[in-house]
Amino acid sequence: MKKFVYIVFILLLSFVNKSLFAQNSNEVTAKMILGNPKYQGMCYGGYRTNTRDKEPTVSEVKEDLKILAAINIKIIRTYNLHHEEILNVLKAITELKKENPKFEMYVMLGAWIDCKNAWTEFPPIHEEESQRNAIEIQKAVELTNQYPEIIKIISVGNEAMVKWATSYYVTPDIILKWVNHLQELKKQEKLPKNLWITSSDNYLSWGGGDAQYHTEDLNKLIEAVDFISMHTYPIHDERFFPEIWGVKENEANLSDKMKIDTAMVRARDYAISQYNGVVKYMKSIGVNKPVEMGETGWTTIDAIYYGVEGSKAADEYKAAQYYKLMREWSNKQKITCFYFEVFDENWKDGSNPNGYENHFGLFNLQNQAKFALWDKIDKGIFKGLTRNGKPITKTYDGNEKALWQDVKVPRFINKQN
């Protein structure tokens, strides 16, 4: 009798284990998401005013997420944990999943990392870290365990190692410390085993350019992360390297549109070259793992550097071309591109409404889709959807001729305007 009971117990235990495995086998993991064109990525911030003092509400975030879902975005990237926005994002996704079990949205959760004295009146100490970093990491752990079905990736830092971030950058050993900490928590089953850990940073920080970044600590970091999340911004780089942007002399007889289109293809190729530089360095140290594009984008307005008085790079047509080209390339190569970004955010340069940082969105703050998404409106993709309670319309009232009044041909390369 005891033997019979024991056999029944073993069979029941086996059944339970198989059931649990079946449930786990249905889990969508970072490994399944990244590099999969079915899971398009986007950088998200939902702030609607020129300050972050007013957080987007759960209802407002739900509006945003429905818009994102309409254009097939299924994973969003966030940046920090010291604002209520991320909590509202997670609550909004949870509510939308309850309302519609087929709704899919996942999160690459950003934990902000600073050096000691960052954003203070004291000189930054880049080799030491802010006490706030430990709080960010702990909060990331807590939220990931609370929302494991939503949070699939933790990113330690945002452009936290690149040396032009002079007010806050840290040395790679600080990022490595926290990546190793999170990886150890996974081993201890204190974080989901399928959670992926990375850091999101400029291509330079990942070894894709200047040799000053090629350090032993960087090599250890590359080995420690589950994948590399690199950033590339041709529109920023052309400000410092003007030879990469503009019209070549042998293109002088092209139409204005063809001159612009050709320049945008070169901008895409420049971004690809930075991506390839990161891959090349990674492989040179004997590592082979996924490299995704954690950020790239193109601003549509600027009063100084990239506008009419500058390089003539910022407008909706060029931004639309860049978006299209980068999506086509990344999808073909099966590389996840977290495009920057979905909505304009005017808090980034709150005292300068026409500052370029405010206008990277595919939508402006007047609930209008920019030129990159006009075709989605034509197809009725946003029908019934709202932002701030108002329907989504086109910029320029949908008048392409009016749009072209703001599109200028870039300068000739190696020539004065």
Model-derived features with residue positions:
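Bacterial N-terminal signal peptides
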Residues: 7-16
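Substrate-binding cleft of extracellular glycoside hydrolase catalytic domains
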Residues: 24-26, 88-195
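Aromatic-rich peripheral "rim/lid" segments of glycoside hydrolase catalytic domains that contact
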Residues: 25-31, 37, 304-325, 329-417
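Alpha-helical scaffolding within the catalytic cores
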Residues: 25-29, 63, 88, 135-142, ...
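N-terminal carbohydrate-binding/catalytic regions of secreted carbohydrate-active enzymes
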Residues: 29, 34-110, 119, 130-137
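Acidic-and-aromatic substrate-binding clefts and catalytic sites of carbohydrate-active enzymes
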Residues: 54-56, 77-89, 115-117, 130-133, ...
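Conserved, mostly hydrophobic/aromatic
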Residues: 76, 154, 228, 293-295, ...
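Noncatalytic carbohydrate-binding groove/subsite architecture in carbohydrate-active enzymes
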Residues: 130, 161, 167-293, 299, ...
